């Protein structure tokens, strides 16, 4: 019984001109996901997947490197224009946005979609250093 050769599944090239970049910047990491208008993921990257570990993940430079990586992947699918949705309190928000603009995307709109509680859950304790 010979084992069947496993097929290598290639990503099909979608030809999408415009999309939405979701930049989620927490205190620990920055993730950037590029979707089409329906919300289907086309490309994603994060500071952690780019090889940054620990406290280096939360730096603006790590967010910039992740944004450059995800923009390269999205441009392979023919993407040219982006709407940017920024969420979270982290330090990688602006640098990720600048890196997306520098990669050659036309940014049509920038929205801050950070969730703000109307006095919901109790927040974590204050940090004393």
UniProtKB/Swiss-Prot annotation:
A Gene Ontology BP annotation from the UniProt entry: translation
Top-rank taxon: Bacteria
Pfam name, any one: Ribosomal_S11
Gene Ontology cellular component list: ribonucleoprotein complex; ribosome
Molecular-function GO terms, alphabetical: rRNA binding; structural constituent of ribosome
The keyword RNA-binding is annotated on this UniProt entry: yes
Leader sequence segment: none
Keywords, ordered alphabetically: Ribonucleoprotein, Ribosomal protein, RNA-binding, rRNA-binding
Family that this chain belongs to: Belongs to the universal ribosomal protein uS11 family.
Role description: Located on the platform of the 30S subunit, it bridges several disparate RNA helices of the 16S rRNA. Forms part of the Shine-Dalgarno cleft in the 70S ribosome.
Subunit note: Part of the 30S ribosomal subunit. Interacts with proteins S7 and S18. Binds to IF-3.
Name of the protein this chain belongs to: Small ribosomal subunit protein uS11
Gene: rpsK
